[in-house]
A protein has these predicted regions:
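Bacterial N-terminal signal peptides
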Residues: 9-20
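N-terminal hydrophobic or amphipathic helices/low-complexity stretches enriched
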Residues: 28-86, 91-103, 156, 365, ...
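Second-shell loop/turn segments in exported
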Residues: 48-56, 72-82, 128-134, 174-186, ...
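A non-catalytic alpha/beta surface segment that caps or lines the substrate-entry region
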Residues: 77-148
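Alpha-helical metal-binding/catalytic segments enriched in His/Glu/Asp
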Residues: 145, 157, 161-222, 348
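His/Asp/Glu-rich mid-to-C-terminal helical/loop segments that flank catalytic regions of hydrolases
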Residues: 202, 324-385
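Metal-dependent peptidase/peptidase-like ectodomains
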Residues: 216-316
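Zn-dependent metallopeptidase/amidohydrolase metal-coordination segment
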Residues: 294-344
């Protein structure tokens, strides 16, 4: 049963107020300030304006957001579900408050019909079937906002910053219904996108290129939301220079050992994006690395894949590829290492700024055979346009 629009809006208003009070309380607890980068030699090279920007990424504020988004109230954020709809409204409210421009077909939303998507996946010809048109639409939404660039020559090129905001929802078992809250997977990525959007939007001087902040529905159903965007891009693919997708950055208890101040990149050496993030890590004290197995293995397992298939140099960053509560009921918000999460998000912020302010765009590695299909897609897109 779905909430009526008015009831949903009222519920969201009340919950947003409650959440912001909670976030403020977390930030003020024990007079804790937002984390700052330690004054190392490498950190000293960060421009003051950029340093001020990344210092706005607060562990305590992110704790407040995540404790709501991964709460039982959102019922595990299945696609589609009431909880997912509520989260979409919440993300849009954060984008609006940050001052991002709405660029979807419905404000901050890129809307799709879940029933049509399901029919098309079962039968590619079903989308043209008259019977499909008689099924009532079931709306699902990517949430998207943009920070326009400042350079007249580069502002019409785009850097994507993404995460998925869905999870597994409620599932039945022999012991009753269980809620899968998905704090690390991927409320951590969603909150990171919100934090990055807020930080960049507060900059006194915007980056040269435009930065698009987007959260996808349906990743757990097979990268559905990101594939929908790839097929229906809001911004020209040939003008989209890179994508950084944020997935599972909250937990440090990887099954291979603790991953503190560590950030892995999928397809690390497929393009120059991995090296750009690694360079950012030198300034923040975060080890950015290629996992010998999982870097390549998981390149196709998250939403970056749908963008890479279009030729965009897009990669996913993660702290823990595998952790004890992965796709389990124990993936709760109180198991997140928020200070570490803020530190890695600052690293991502520096990488985004580097790409957004560089006249040159990241390239696929033509010498790497694993990148060949993506390079071919990029070349084909340039030829067509």
């Amino acid at each position: 049963m779905k909430l009526k629009n008015s009831a949903l809006s009222l519920c969201l208003t009340l919950l947003t107020s409650q959440l912001m009070m909670q976030a403020t309380a977390f930030a003020q607890k024990d007079n804790l300030p937002a984390l700052t980068i330690s004054a190392t030699k490498s950190a000293a090279s960060i421009a003051p304006a950029l340093q001020a920007t990344i210092d706005k990424i607060s562990a305590n504020a992110m704790r407040g957001h995540l404790s709501f988004l991964a709460s039982d109230l959102l019922e595990g954020r299945d696609t589609p579900s009431r909880g997912l709809d509520l989260e979409a409204e919440y993300i849009a409210a954060q984008f609006r408050a940050s001052g991002l421009e709405a660029v979807g077909d419905d404000g901050y939303f890129q809307t799709a019909d879940w029933n049509k998507i399901k029919s098309a996946r079962r039968n590619p010809d079903a989308a043209e079937n008259a019977d499909v048109a008689t099924i009532p639409p079931l709306k699902v939404r990517n949430v998207v906002g943009i920070l326009r660039g400042s350079d007249p020559l580069l502002r019409d090129s785009y850097v994507l910053v993404t995460a998925h905001y869905d999870h597994l929802g409620i599932r039945k078992s022999l012991f009753g219904e269980k809620i899968y809250n998905g704090a690390n997977d991927d409320a951590s990525g969603t909150v990171s996108v919100i934090a990055l959007a807020q930080a960049f939007a507060a900059m006194p001087e915007r980056p040269k290129r435009s930065i698009v902040f987007m959260t996808f529905f349906g990743e757990e159903k097979g990268l559905v939301g990101s594939r929908y965007y790839g097929a229906h891009p809001i911004f020209p693919i040939e003008k989209t220079v890179a994508g950084i997708n944020i997935e599972q950055v909250g937990r440090t208890d990887d099954t291979e050992g603790a991953q503190v101040a560590s950030l892995a990149v999928t397809g690390f050496d497929f393009s120059e994006v991995g090296a750009i993030i690694q360079q950012a890590g030198l300034a923040t004290g975060v080890k950015v690395w290629k996992h010998p197995v999982n870097s390549n293995r998981y390149f196709g397992a998250s939403d970056n894949q749908a963008l890479a298939d279009q030729g965009i140099p897009a990669h996913t960053v993660s702290v823990a590829y595998e952790f004890p509560d992965y796709h389990g009921t124990g993936d709760h918000w109180d198991k997140i290492d928020y200070e570490n999460m803020a530190k890695v998000d600052r690293t991502v912020a520096l990488a985004i700024a580097s790409i957004a302010n560089d006249d040159k765009v990241p390239q696929w590695d033509a010498a790497n055979p694993k990148a060949a299909r993506y390079l071919a897609a990029w070349k084909a897109r340039q030829v067509r346009n």
